[in-house]
Amino acid sequence: MGMAGYSFVHFDLETTLKTLKTLDMHYLCIKDFHLPLDSNEEQIAAFHQKLADYGVKGYAVGPIYMKSKAEVDRAFAYARRVGVSLLVGVPNYELLDYVEEAVKQYDIRLAIHLHGPDMPLYPDATDIWNHVKDRDERMGMCLDIGHNLRYGSDSLADYIRYHKRVFDMHLKDVTAPTKAGQRAEVGRGIIDFPRFIKLLRKYHYTGAVSLEHEKDMKNPFMGIAESIGFFRGVCQATR
């Protein structure tokens, strides 16, 4: 399991890392409010040392939005400086040819993040698949199972269909398969987590499943702990 840095958008890095240590979590998807895109080598080294002090590794960066070629260049250069091999990103559709060249140049995998009904860009897994299926195999998706479901798409069925291009996952639960569905602590919504975990094992998923907690974001700690505990419990119970 990992943690999506966005879960701590209202908190500094120290608070984030203390929380991860308390939860015995060791993998973080790095957001740029914790490590700015213009960070230099010295700042990045200090950042990694701070993570190491808490037993945490930054396994990816993002999500990073890319609305121009310059922003594509900046995102991939940042990922290389940070030293990760996975960039969670949201490039505009018209930039995908340019993004593909960057993927080849940097040899960094791109996991396009979907946002369900909340924005028109990459609303679900099928949309991402249709845009990457004929491109470099290092272009795939960050499957956000909650956002995907709120768009009306079956996240578990989509994982089965597209698992070869699922490089990262954002874990959350929701209360309904519509835009009106609310974010919920994992286990309190409608997602079938025992089946989800069994599918991850069946298809030999090797990426991170990172909690992106988007409920009570100014006081998320109890919800984060509940979600992590539930998910771990289901993992144990389904072995």
Description of each model-found segment:
Residues 1, 5, 9-26, 125, ...:
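Histidine-acidic metal/acid-base catalytic patches
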Residues 1-86, 104, 164, 228-239:
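N-terminal pre-domain/capping segments
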Residues 14-17, 50, 54-141, 149-151, ...:
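Active-site acidic/histidine proton-transfer and metal-coordination neighborhood
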Residues 35-36, 118-119, 148-149, 176-177:
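Short gly/pro/ser/thr-enriched loop/turn and capping motifs at secondary-structure boundaries
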Residues 37, 44, 72, 89, ...:
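Flexible, glycine- and charge-enriched loops at secondary-structure boundaries
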